[in-house]
């Protein structure tokens, strides 16, 4: 298990990290949320806000690189089997390793009133329901080396004042930056569409969700907390 400096815990409502044996180990087909104890299973079908029936074969596998990460090779997806709440302010802070390719989901909350978050979609490397759109290069490059086959720390936030993205702990000016729908809700998806398609094929490290908009200092704190592990 990797142990590093503290991440931000104020407002933390969800956290998974394959570097923690309390969350996930080699051979597991589910992971355990380290904050509220929610089960996280292989995404299957389109459960909306009802009961999710997991597909164990669709859960990412354990990869020992970087102290332990979730490996989505071949296309995998996670369903959070619990209710993360309907919010008016939220943040997602995570380590991503994007494999080459066209559109893939980072997250999707549309099973229960949330919004999609896509990569390499409509000529943007990161696109949070068109409310926030960001490119690592200008013009858009689907194979941008700053994003593809490279570990990147990303924090996105939204509240009534708008949305922001931080890349490797630094604020990055994005297109639009209007407020998103901050709901996570029931059966929130990581790495797949709410109907289980266009799945992530790279890797993901630690993944943290908050019921607040992280500040610039807090986004930097989360990056610094584990940069020696991933970079």
Model-predicted regions and their roles:
Residues 1-7, 71-92, 138-146, 192-196:
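Short surface loop/edge beta-strand patches of beta-sandwich-type extracellular domains
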Residues 26, 31, 35-44, 51, ...:
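Extracellular glycan-recognition modules
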Residues 1-74, 220-231:
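Extracytoplasmic low-complexity segments
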Residues 137, 166-169:
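Short strand-turn-strand beta-turns centered on an Asx-Gly dipeptide
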Residues 150-164:
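Localized edge beta-strand/strand-to-loop motifs within extracellular or lumenal beta-rich domains
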């Amino acid at each position: 298990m990797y142990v590093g400096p503290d991440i931000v815990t104020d407002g933390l409502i969800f956290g998974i990290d394959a570097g923690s044996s309390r969350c996930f180990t080699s051979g597991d087909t589910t992971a355990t949320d380290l904050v509220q104890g929610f089960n996280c299973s292989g995404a299957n079908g389109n459960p909306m806000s009802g009961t999710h029936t997991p597909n164990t074969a669709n859960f990412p596998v354990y990869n020992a690189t970087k102290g332990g990460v979730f490996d989505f090779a071949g296309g995998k997806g996670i369903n959070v089997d619990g209710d993360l709440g309907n919010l008016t302010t939220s943040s997602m802070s995570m380590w991503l390793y994007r494999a080459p390719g066209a559109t893939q989901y980072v997250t999707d909350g549309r099973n229960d009133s949330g919004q999609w978050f896509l990569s390499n979609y409509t000529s943007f490397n990161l696109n949070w329901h068109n409310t926030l759109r960001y490119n690592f290069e200008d013009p858009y490059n689907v194979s941008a080396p700053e994003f593809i086959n490279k570990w990147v720390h990303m924090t996105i936030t939204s509240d009534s004042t708008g949305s922001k993205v931080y890349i490797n702990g630094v604020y990055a000016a994005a297109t639009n930056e209007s407020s998103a729908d901050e709901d996570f809700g029931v059966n929130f998806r990581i790495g797949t569409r709410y109907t289980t398609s266009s799945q992530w094929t790279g890797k993901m490290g630690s993944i943290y969700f908050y019921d607040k908009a992280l500040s610039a200092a807090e986004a930097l704190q989360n990056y610094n907390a584990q940069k020696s592990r991933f970079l």
